[in-house]
């Protein structure tokens, strides 16, 4: 098998001389080579010179494997001498050789640029060169070059050399004889090559016509007289060097394929496949005839004609091998590319000769090249420098190192070839004629080929059709045979079935006759046996009754004895217990007496220790003061020494810092170098990883391609399987009728068997009474059944063949299904693999992005480090400058230290003097008759009001305790105050009538008024006589006696004790330290503040309207009223939080001249501002912050506040209050909470009352203050605000003796505590969630929960604000009312700025996250809504409402939110978009599923209100339960939500399948508390009217995966525990309610 390889056209470059004729010849040669030779032949790369125009690029190829030439005449040829070659052939042979020559020639390539590079020197040198060949010399002396200046000598020498070679080789004298073929192309002996056609050429030059004919004679190819010429392609040249003028070619193979000669023309159609290049010819030596014959015995070359015109042109020579032609004249020319060549860089070339042609004959020019092989030894004879060879031929005939050959004796030789060209011309008409004939012939051949293909295709289609007809006929025959067999089988089976039926009918008739006879006999025998059995049973029964009576009598006697013994033991046990109780009571009383004595002794010892410790402390303070003064002096001296040492160390530090800076700079430079290396290494690693990734991607692409091919294979198998499946279905359809007939027969047998089994069952019922006969009948029936089964087995055997066939088909089908599953598995694996590869690709992309990010980060860090280093450089420079400055200032600093030392010594002397004066002033001030003492005695008392005659005991104790404290005023002074400033105070000016400090002291006119009263009392005291009846003196004396005789804790009142214990709280769930306390009740002192507040609200009404917008609370809590164009900062209390109390103090109200009283009590009750007190001018001044004054206000403590502070510094908790703290008393707590943001709104009102050892939990309005005990009312004075707390403390102290009894009763009774935390996730949830109790005995899953909702609406149907029962269906909750308002709002296009933060959210803990999404910022209004949800529409009609998104907390005004806000489909949860609703579903799904069940419970309640039948059943259960157990509620228990929905849809008849005792239950109040039911349900059960109403609750058992649990009750009093922050309180509540908090997330 041979392959046709196209070969690039090769450029042949002429370097023999200049010429004006430019031609271009392109040749495409087709070559057939054996397959086994393709790997051995190295095809050279032939260069092609590009065309300079479109005409130059024209090519026309014949459809055969011969070459086509295109010759373009580009310019006028150069005139040259015409060379005539004598021919020895006839004219006919000339035409044949001309045709063959036309097929073997190539186009001449013209390149005008080459001609321009030829110099005159080159032309002259080349024209003067001549070559002399000596054929008689041996191989070593093969080449002998001689140069002459006469050009004619060259021609003579060449002709002489040619004649000698012809005589030596003994070849034919034909001038155009062909050389022998090479050894590599020897033909197979069985297929000799055909002789080539003759080649003829006709040339017209002027008026002379020259015809040349080349004849190819069939002769032996191994003719020794034939020579070959090597040829080297252009591709061996370097790309940077000019092309050589002559190319040679070398052959390295030993095979030859016969050339295919066919007529062609230049206008023919090019062939589809370009012909391959000619076979290379091995390099041979031509030194002698013997060596020539030895090396060229099997060589052959192509015939190429040459002419003198070709030798004179610049065109490149052909690749074709040529025979030697004697040349008479050889003018040389320069190389076509450049004039300078190195012989070792260029292939071997030859000289060419040219002659002048006419321009009209250029198109028909043909080229024949003759090659003469010239060898040269490796000694490089007469070699000139490489720059310019000595001979003109050397520059054109280089000897590359690769073009060498080895002779027979092993010595290396280099070879050189010289090409000669002869061009012939032909007639144009002859060429056109041949072209037309070739075209017609090719068209005819193509038409014949197409006809043959059509005939073959038609014959193949006929054969396929006949084969299909044959197969179809065979299929029909097999189907008809199968149908005939099936029909015969059916008929046979039908006949057999009829025979069996007849035999069975006869057998059954015989069996019935025998059975009737047997039954008659059995009936008679059975009657006889029944009579005997009845007599035996009567006897046994009588005997058993007698024995039973005897046993019962013995048991009765034994029980009576045991009862008497048990009564005796009980009496003895009761007596023993009574004696033991009396003994324990006596022991307890004795222990209490001993403990009381011990406590009194311990208290006495403690007082003695305290007095002793006080004395020791006083002496210690005096000693410490003296030591402190001495220590200060020593410290001053040590400080001076330290400063001198510090100066020295600073100098050393500066030097050390300089050295460190230099070292740091060196380290910085080293770090920069390392970081640069690190960045370069990272870049290198990234490139390596990128290369690996690309390789992995390439491997993945290949793997995907393999998977695609496998997928195609799987698809083909699937198609084949589907075809086979269709064939199987067709076979099964034909077999279905047989199987169906067998199935019907089997069903008939089954029916008979069932009938027989039914009769057998009847017989078994009769055989219970007669076992022996029954056994015989069973054996007979078994024998009959065995026969029937035998017949069935025989019938089944006949069907085994069909079943086996069906089984085989089923097995085949299963196999196909298995293969299908395998294919599906392969598909799945392929899909997984592709997905895995996709993920890997994404991972690689991510890694690449990460690496890029890391590189960017490294660069950014490098830039940042660079900035840091620059800053360090600047800082180092600055430090150096500072060190130079500090060195200059060191002398000045030493002088300054000396001056400071002297000034400090003077200051110390002045300080000692002033301290002495201060002590003298203090002694004078503490004198009995000093102005300070008189001011204390004459100031208004704390309890003094307009009705001073009424004073409570608690107030007297507090006031007396305060009055007994000595008040000392210590005025602090600033450190910068001068030494003489201590003398300029009010103590030094005490006796002056006018004190300038009075105007600035506390900034109040009350101090001036008080001081005037003190001065008047002092003067009266000095001038009046001592009166023993003076009440002031008597009271002072009494107070002094009490201080010395009574223990200090006994004078401590409960009010102060409660203050120090932080018990002035109003909530049990919130940490309120640091917040204003709530309002306790009305007071006359609130009137001035109310007026001021009303005026403030009137002035800032526009602020209240803006405060409802939550966006103003984003950044600041101050509002900015316009005042002279400047914003005035005022502290905003944020519209009063729900947990913020209405704190109103006399300190914050303006001074009232009609009523002047002390502010100590207000200061006592307000812990938040105790550390920072301001002048009580008015409320606005209290929190105003001036824009230009940003410094904090300095605290100015008034004399009364200082006095009270000193009086309460050392107070302790009295023992009577600590030991007898009230326990189990009525504790009323009211908590209102309304959260912001995601923090919920909740209202919890809890009242826990202990009565007779029981506890009840009720939901009630806020508590009413209790009435005072003993009909003693507190005066309307300064304690009016706190009278509730004082009254409570008085009650607790007056009833201390009742505490022990109440504790005893509490221990004996069953105390049930209902927690104060009743937060279910909604404001008024009305439902509970719990696990299914075990007592219910229901089979439920682990995730089943019981959702219970109570019908808590028991109010009247009419209301002052409308019939809301009809409007809301009786379900009045916060969510339902707010949702109805939201649905009624008309949407607008208003777009408000939303606030993503939590507007008005305080930092206190909020109990849940399910507060209503619709709210208003007016907390007082929201409190009213919480109390009365049914009045929500009326309360909120003038308020601005907002809606908040549960997911992103986006806030909108109600009308604007109506456009795009959406809600959950099952509950009242709002979202700003469907995306937020989708994103929040994982967190909301648990509660929402719970809410759906809650809604379904409410639907059941509403259905019951309309269902009279249900009400009748429930009313009966309620009456019976109340008459038996007391108050309680009726509960309807539904086992699933589907059952509840069925009841809502169909009414009570949907529950008719369930008994009432499985649906309706009655729970007492005690059971509800024990099961922790909804507090509102318990409250309703305690107050409803049983004769008129009943309470209903609905329980649905639902399987909810994440259902919130009912929070457990609070087991301890959180208000009694101190917390450092709201966060700590939140954590405490969270730990206590772990099950509840585990289901919901809370935000604090």
Swiss-Prot record:
The coiled-coil domain is sufficient to localize to apical junctions. Residues 30-41, 160-174, 307-327, 410-455, 744-791, 815-851, 1012-1022, 1032-1051, 1141-1150, 1164-1173, 1183-1198 have a biased composition (Basic and acidic residues). Residues 190-199 have a biased composition (Pro residues). It is found in: Apical cell membrane; Cell projection, Cilium; Cell junction, Adherens junction. Zn(2+) 1 binds at residues 1445, 1448, 1472, 1476. Residues 254-272, 282-306, 799-814 have a biased composition (Low complexity). Residues 428-924 form a coiled coil. Disruption phenotype: Mutant embryos enclose normally and initiate elongation without obvious morphological abnormalities, yet at a slower rate than the wild type. Elongation is consistently arrested at the 2-3-fold stage, accompanied by the formation of a large vacuole in the posterior region. Controls adherens junction integrity. Required for the correct rate and completion of elongation of the embryos. It comes from Caenorhabditis elegans. The gene is ajm-1. Zn(2+) 2 binds at residues 1464, 1467, 1484, 1488. This is Apical junction molecule ajm-1. The keyword Cell membrane applies.
């Amino acid at each position: 098998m041979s392959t046709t390889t196209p070969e690039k056209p090769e450029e042949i470059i002429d370097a023999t001389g200049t010429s004006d004729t430019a031609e271009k010849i392109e040749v495409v040669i087709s070559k057939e080579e054996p397959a086994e030779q393709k790997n051995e032949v190295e095809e050279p790369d032939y260069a092609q010179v590009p065309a300079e125009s479109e005409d130059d690029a024209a090519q026309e190829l014949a459809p055969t494997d011969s070459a086509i030439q295109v010759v373009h005449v580009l310019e006028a040829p150069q005139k040259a001498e015409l060379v005539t070659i004598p021919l020895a052939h006839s004219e006919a042979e000339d035409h044949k050789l001309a045709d063959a020559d036309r097929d073997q020639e190539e186009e001449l390539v013209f390149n005008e640029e080459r001609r321009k590079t030829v110099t005159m020197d080159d032309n002259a040198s080349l024209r003067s060169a001549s070559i002399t060949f000596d054929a008689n010399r041996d191989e070593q002396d093969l080449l002998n070059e001689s140069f002459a200046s006469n050009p004619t000598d060259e021609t003579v020498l060449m002709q002489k050399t040619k004649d000698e070679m012809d005589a030596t080789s003994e070849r034919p004298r034909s001038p155009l004889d062909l050389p022998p073929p090479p050894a590599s192309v020897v033909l197979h002996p069985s297929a000799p090559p055909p002789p080539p056609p003759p080649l003829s050429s006709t040339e017209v030059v002027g008026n002379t016509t020259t015809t040349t004919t080349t004849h190819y004679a069939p002769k032996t190819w191994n003719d020794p007289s034939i020579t070959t010429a090597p040829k080297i392609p252009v591709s061996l040249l370097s790309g940077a060097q000019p092309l050589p003028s002559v190319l040679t070619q070398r052959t390295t193979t030993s095979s030859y394929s016969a050339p295919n000669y066919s007529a062609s023309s230049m206008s023919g159609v090019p062939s589809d496949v370009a012909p391959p290049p000619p076979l290379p010819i091995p390099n041979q030596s031509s030194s002698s005839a013997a060596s020539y014959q030895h090396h060229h015995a099997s060589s052959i070359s192509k015939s190429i004609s040459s002419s003198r015109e070709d030798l004179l042109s610049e065109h490149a020579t052909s690749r074709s091998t040529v025979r030697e032609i004697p040349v008479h004249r050889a003018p040389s020319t320069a190389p076509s590319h450049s004039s300078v060549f190195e012989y070792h860089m260029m292939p071997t070339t030859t000289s060419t000769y040219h002659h002048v042609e006419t321009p009209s004959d250029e198109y028909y020019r043909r080229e024949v090249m003759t090659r003469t092989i010239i060898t040269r030894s490796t000694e490089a004879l007469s070699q000139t420098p490489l720059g310019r060879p000595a001979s003109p031929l050397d520059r054109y005939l280089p000897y590359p190192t690769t073009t060498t050959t080895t002779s027979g004796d092993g010595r290396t030789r280099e070879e050189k070839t010289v090409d000669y060209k002869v061009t012939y011309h032909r007639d144009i008409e002859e060429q056109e004629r041949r072209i037309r004939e070739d075209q017609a012939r090719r068209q005819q051949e193509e038409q014949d080929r197409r006809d043959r293909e059509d005939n073959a295709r038609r014959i193949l289609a006929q054969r396929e059709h006949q084969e299909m007809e044959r197969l179809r006929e065979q299929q029909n025959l097999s189907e008809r045979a199968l149908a005939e067999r099936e029909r015969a089988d059916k008929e046979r089976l039908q006949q057999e079935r009829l025979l069996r039926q007849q035999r069975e009918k006869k057998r059954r008739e015989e069996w019935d006759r025998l059975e009737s006879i047997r039954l008659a006999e059995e009936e008679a025998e059975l009657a006889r046996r029944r009579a005997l059995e009845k007599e035996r049973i009567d006897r046994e029964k009588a005997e058993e009754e007698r024995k039973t009576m005897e046993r019962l009598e013995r048991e009765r006697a034994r029980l009576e004895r045991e009862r008497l013994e048990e009564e005796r033991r009980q009496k003895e046990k009761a007596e023993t217990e009574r004696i033991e109780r009396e003994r324990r009571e006596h022991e307890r009383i004795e222990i209490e007496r001993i403990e009381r004595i011990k406590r009194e002794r311990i208290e006495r010892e403690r007082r003695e220790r305290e007095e002793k410790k006080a004395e020791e402390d006083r002496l210690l303070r005096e000693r410490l003061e003296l030591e402190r003064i001495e220590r200060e002096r020593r410290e001053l001296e040590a400080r001076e020494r330290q400063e001198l040492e510090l100066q020295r160390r600073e100098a050393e530090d500066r030097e050390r810092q300089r050295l460190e800076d230099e070292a740091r700079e060196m380290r910085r430079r080293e770090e920069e170098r390392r970081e640069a290396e690190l960045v370069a290494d990272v870049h290198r690693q990234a490139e390596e990883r990128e290369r690996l990734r690309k390789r992995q991607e390439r491997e993945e692409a290949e793997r995907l391609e393999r998977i695609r091919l496998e997928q195609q294979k799987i698809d083909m198998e699937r198609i084949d399987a589907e075809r086979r499946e269709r064939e199987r279905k067709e076979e099964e359809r034909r077999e279905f009728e047989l199987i169906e007939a067998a199935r019907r027969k089997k069903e008939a047998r089954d029916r008979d068997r069932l009938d027989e089994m039914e009769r057998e069952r009847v017989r078994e019922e009769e055989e219970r009474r007669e076992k022996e006969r029954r056994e015989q009948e069973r054996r007979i029936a078994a024998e009959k059944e065995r026969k029937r089964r035998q017949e069935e087995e025989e019938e089944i055997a006949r069907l085994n063949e069909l079943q086996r066939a069906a089984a085989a088909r089923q097995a085949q089908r299963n196999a196909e299904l298995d293969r299908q599953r395998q294919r599906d598995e392969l598909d799945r694996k392929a899909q997984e693999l592709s997905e895995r590869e996709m993920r890997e690709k994404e991972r690689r992309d991510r890694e690449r992005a990460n690496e890029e990010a890391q590189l960017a980060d490294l660069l950014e860090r490098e830039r940042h480090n660079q900035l840091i280093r620059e800053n360090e450089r600047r800082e180092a420079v600055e430090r150096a400058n500072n060190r130079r400055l500090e060195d200059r200032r060191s002398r000045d600093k030493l002088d300054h230290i000396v001056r400071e030392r002297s000034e400090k010594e003077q200051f110390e002397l002045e300080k000692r003097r002033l301290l002495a004066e201060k002590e003298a002033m203090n002694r004078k001030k503490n004198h009995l008759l000093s102005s300070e003492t008189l001011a204390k005695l004459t100031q208004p008392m704390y309890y003094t009001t307009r009705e001073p005659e009424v004073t409570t005991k608690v107030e007297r104790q507090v006031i007396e305790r305060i009055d007994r404290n000595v008040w000392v005023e210590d005025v602090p002074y600033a450190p910068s105050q001068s030494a003489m400033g201590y003398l300029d105070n009010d103590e030094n000016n005490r006796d002056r009538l006018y004190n300038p400090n009075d105007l600035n002291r506390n900034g109040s006119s009350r101090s001036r008024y008080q001081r005037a009263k003190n001065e008047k009392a002092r003067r009266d005291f000095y001038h009046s006589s001592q009166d023993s009846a003076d009440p002031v003196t008597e009271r002072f004396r009494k107070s002094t006696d009490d201080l010395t005789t009574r223990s200090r804790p006994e004078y401590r009142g409960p009010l102060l004790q409660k203050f120090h214990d932080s018990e002035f709280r109003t909530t049990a769930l919130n940490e309120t330290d640091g917040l204003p306390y709530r309002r306790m009740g009305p007071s006359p002192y609130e009137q001035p503040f109310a007026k001021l507040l009303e005026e403030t609200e009137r002035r800032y009404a526009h602020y209240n309207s803006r405060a409802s917008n939550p966006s103003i609370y984003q950044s600041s809590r101050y509002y900015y009223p316009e005042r002279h164009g400047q914003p005035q900062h005022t502290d905003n209390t944020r519209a009063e939080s729900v947990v913020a109390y209405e704190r109103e103090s006399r300190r914050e109200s303006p001074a009232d001249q009609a009523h002047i009283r002390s502010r100590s009590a207000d200061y006592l009750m307000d812990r938040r501002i105790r550390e920072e007190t301001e002048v009580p001018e008015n409320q606005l001044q209290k929190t105003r912050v001036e824009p230009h004054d940003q410094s904090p206000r300095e605290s100015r403590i008034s004399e009364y506040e200082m006095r009270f502070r000193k009086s309460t510094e050392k107070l302790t908790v009295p023992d009577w209050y600590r030991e007898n703290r009230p326990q189990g008393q009525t504790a009323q707590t009211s908590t209102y909470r309304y959260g912001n943001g995601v923090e919920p709104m909740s209202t919890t009102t809890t009242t826990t009352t202990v009565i007779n050892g029981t506890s009840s939990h009720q939901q009630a309005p806020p508590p009413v203050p209790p009435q005072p005990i003993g009909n003693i009312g507190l005066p309307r004075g300064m304690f009016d605000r706190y009278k509730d707390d004082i009254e409570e403390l008085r009650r607790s102290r007056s009833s201390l003796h009742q505490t022990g009894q109440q504790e005893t009763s509490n221990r004996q009774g069953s105390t049930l505590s209902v927690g104060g935390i009743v937060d279910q996730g909604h404001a008024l949830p009305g439902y509970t969630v719990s696990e299914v109790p075990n007592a219910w005995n229901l089979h439920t899953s682990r995730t089943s929960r019981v959702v219970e909702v109570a019908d808590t609406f028991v109010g009247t149907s009419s209301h002052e604000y409308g019939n809301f029962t009809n409007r809301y269906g009786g379900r009045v909750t916060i969510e339902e009312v707010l949702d109805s308002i939201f649905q009624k709002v008309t949407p607008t296009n208003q777009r408000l700025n939303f606030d993503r933060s939590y507007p008005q959210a305080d930092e206190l803990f909020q109990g849940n996250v399910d507060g209503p999404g619709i709210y208003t910022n007016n907390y007082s209004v929201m409190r009213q809504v919480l109390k009365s949800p049914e009045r929500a529409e009326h309360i909120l009609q003038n308020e601005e409402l907002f809606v908040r998104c549960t997911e992103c907390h986006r806030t909108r005004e109600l009308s604007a939110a109506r456009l795009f806000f959406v809600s959950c489909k099952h509950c009242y949860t709002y979202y700003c978009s469907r995306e937020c609703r989708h994103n929040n579903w994982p967190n909301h799904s648990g509660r929402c599923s719970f809410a759906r069940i809650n809604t379904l419970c409410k639907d059941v309640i509403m259905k019951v209100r309309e269902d009279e039948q249900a009400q009748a059943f429930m009313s009966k259960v309620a009456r019976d339960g109340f008459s038996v157990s007391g108050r309680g509620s009726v509960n309807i228990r539904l086992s699933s939500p589907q059952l509840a929905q069925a009841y809502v849809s169909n009414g009570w008849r949907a529950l008719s399948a369930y008994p009432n005792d499985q649906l309706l239950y009655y729970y007492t109040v005690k059971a509800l508390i024990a099961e922790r039911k909804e507090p509102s349900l318990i409250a309703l059960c305690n107050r409803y009217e049983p004769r008129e109403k009943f309470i209903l609750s609905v329980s649905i058992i639902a399987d909810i995966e994440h259902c919130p649990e009912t929070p457990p009750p609070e087991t301890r009093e959180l208000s009694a525990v101190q917390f450092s922050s709201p966060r700590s309180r939140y954590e405490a509540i969270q730990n206590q309610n772990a099950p509840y908090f585990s289901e919901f997330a809370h935000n604090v």
